[in-house]
UniProtKB/Swiss-Prot annotation:
Belongs to the ABC transporter superfamily. Thiamine importer (TC 3.A.1.19.1) family. Keywords: ATP-binding, Cell inner membrane, Cell membrane, Membrane, Nucleotide-binding, Translocase, Transport. One of its GO terms (molecular function) is ATP hydrolysis activity. This is Thiamine import ATP-binding protein ThiQ. The gene is thiQ. It catalyses: thiamine(out) + ATP + H2O = thiamine(in) + ADP + phosphate + H(+).
Length: 234
């Protein structure tokens, strides 16, 4: 469904080289030490940066000529990126139309997405009136209204306390199932990876060194770099 084929990206003296296959409907935890290239991989997929060679395809269609908003994916960051002067409803509506010229059908999509993530009673509030967990739910609703099949998560739970973190994991588990999403999730938490992911990809030294089912992470023979990483983050 989603493939990085001999993708190369250079940042100053660092050369990133990615080969990765993601099956439709899978949830892939992107693991690896800081600076290894995890967020770089997501940025390449999202179209925020361009590779110098190789191809990135979704359903056998190259994404390289498409602008970020044209790609069949949405992205949830560690920082929720809500606009302080816009209401919750308007922040969600940006996922449909950036100019916020919303018709009744659009407003229904906003209400439906807000209900799915549990913020339908907060639609008229401003971000400053929300808790951290509520802000992240609003950002997730903005992803949902885009109705795109691939969801990218870049350490979305790292700023949340343990209770809110667990609530978000349960919520995203339900949304993955109901919306039939394919997910790539950058995380440093093995607990989050085991809770959400069906597969993993381990990035080290700017390459994908290992990938497989999450159930194999602690049982199969693996590169020494992955063994060392797992011991460090336990």
């Amino acid at each position: 469904m989603l493939r990085f084929s001999d993708v190369k990206y250079r940042y100053y003296t660092d050369l990133f080289e990615f080969d990765l296959n993601v099956e439709q409907g899978s949830v892939v935890a992107i693991l690896g030490p800081s600076g290894a290239g995890k967020s770089t991989l997501l940025s390449l997929l999202a179209g925020f940066i361009e590779p110098e060679s190789g191809d990135i395809t979704i359903n056998n269609e190259s994404q390289l000529s498409l602008a970020p908003h044209q790609r069949p994916l949405s992205m949830l960051f560690q920082e929720h990126n809500l606009f302080a002067h816009l209401s919750v409803a308007e922040n969600i509506g940006l996922g449909i139309k950036p100019n916020l010229r919303l018709n009744e059908k659009d407003k229904k999509r906003i209400n439906d997405a807000a209900r799915q993530v549990g913020v339908d009673d907060l639609l008229q509030r401003l971000p400053e009136q929300l808790s951290g967990g509520q802000k992240q739910r609003v950002a997730l609703a903005r992803c949902l209204v885009q109705q795109k099949p691939v969801l990218l998560l870049d350490e979305p739970f790292s700023a949340l306390d343990p209770i809110l973190r667990e609530e978000m994991i349960v919520l995203i588990q339900a949304l993955i199932k109901s919306e039939k999403l394919t997910v790539l999730m950058v995380t440093h938490s093995l607990q989050d990876a085991k809770a959400l992911a069906s597969h993993y990809a381990f990035i080290c030294q700017q390459k994908v060194l290992s990938q497989g089912r999450i159930s194999e992470l602690f049982t199969q023979e693996k590169p020494p770099e992955l063994t060392q990483y797992l011991q460090a983050v336990k």
